[in-house]
C-alpha cells in the first residue's frame, strides 16, 4: 500500500469540515470523521493532535478557500465600483454555495472565537483582501465614486455581516 500523507491529511480535513459543520464542535465525533475520511483515529491524532486542533485546522482551511476564491476575482483590475459590487455578490454567493463555512463560523462564535484566537494563520490569510479593499477605496475615492475616510476592515466586516446574517439565521427568519 502506497502512503500518501498529504492526500490522507486532506481527506481528514474534508471529513472534519463536513462533520463539524453538521454537528458542531461538541457533537462531532472523531470516529465519524475517521470513517468519512476512510482512515483511523490514530492518523487523525497523528496529523492534528486533538479534536480542538482539528477543528481549528478545518476553520483555517475554509478561510483559506474563501480567500483564494476572492483572490481569483482580481478586483484590483476592475473599476472600483464594479469591483465592490463583484465582491459583495461573491461574498453572498460564497455563503450560499458553502453553507459549511457559515456553520463552522456559527460553531466558533458559540465558543467565543476560542480557536481562531489561537490561529497564527487566519490574520495573514485575511490581510491581502483588506489591503486590496483599501486600494479599491482609494481608487474609488480619487474617481469620486466613494466617500473619503472609509475603513477597509470595517467595510469588509459590514459586507460579510450582511451576507452572513441571512444564512446564519435562515431557519429562524423563514
Predicted segments, located by residue:
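Short, structured helix-loop boundary elements
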Residues: 2, 9-10, 30, 52, ...
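Generic hydrophobic, amphipathic alpha-helix propensity
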Residues: 8-16, 33, 58-62, 66, ...
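Helix-turn-helix
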Residues: 11, 19-53, 57-58
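Short alpha-helical functional segments enriched in proximate histidine and acidic residues
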Residues: 19, 94, 136
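Short coil/turn segments at alpha/beta junctions that flank glycine-rich nucleotide-binding fingerprints
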Residues: 22-26, 76-77, 98, 143
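Short helix-capping/turn signature of helix-turn-helix
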Residues: 48, 107-113
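Hydrophobic alpha-helical connector segments
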Residues: 71-103, 124-126, 130, 152-159
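Hydrophobic/aromatic-rich alpha-helical bundle segments in the mid-to-C-terminal region
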Residues: 100-104, 117-119, 123, 139-174
Amino acid at each position: 500500500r502506497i502512503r500518501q500523507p498529504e492526500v490522507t491529511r486532506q481527506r481528514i480535513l474534508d471529513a472534519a469540515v463536513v462533520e463539524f459543520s453538521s454537528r458542531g464542535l461538541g457533537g462531532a465525533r472523531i470516529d465519524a470523521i475517521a470513517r468519512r475520511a476512510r482512515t483511523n483515529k490514530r492518523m487523525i491524532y497523528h496529523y492534528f493532535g486533538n479534536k480542538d486542533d482539528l477543528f481549528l485546522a478545518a476553520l483555517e482551511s475554509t478561510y483559506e478557500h474563501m480567500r483564494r476564491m476572492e483572490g481569483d476575482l482580481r478586483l484590483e483590475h476592475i473599476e472600483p465600483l464594479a469591483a465592490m459590487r463583484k465582491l459583495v455578490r461573491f461574498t453572498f454567493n460564497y455563503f450560499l454555495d458553502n453553507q459549511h463555512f457559515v456553520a463552522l463560523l456559527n460553531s466558533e462564535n458559540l465558543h467565543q472565537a476560542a480557536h481562531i484566537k489561537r490561529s497564527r494563520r487566519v490574520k495573514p490569510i485575511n490581510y491581502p483582501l483588506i489591503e486590496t479593499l483599501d486600494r479599491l477605496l482609494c481608487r474609488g475615492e480619487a474617481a469620486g465614486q466613494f466617500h473619503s475616510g472609509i475603513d477597509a476592515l470595517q467595510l469588509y466586516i459590514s459586507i460579510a455581516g450582511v451576507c452572513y446574517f441571512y444564512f446564519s439565521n435562515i431557519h429562524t427568519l423563514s
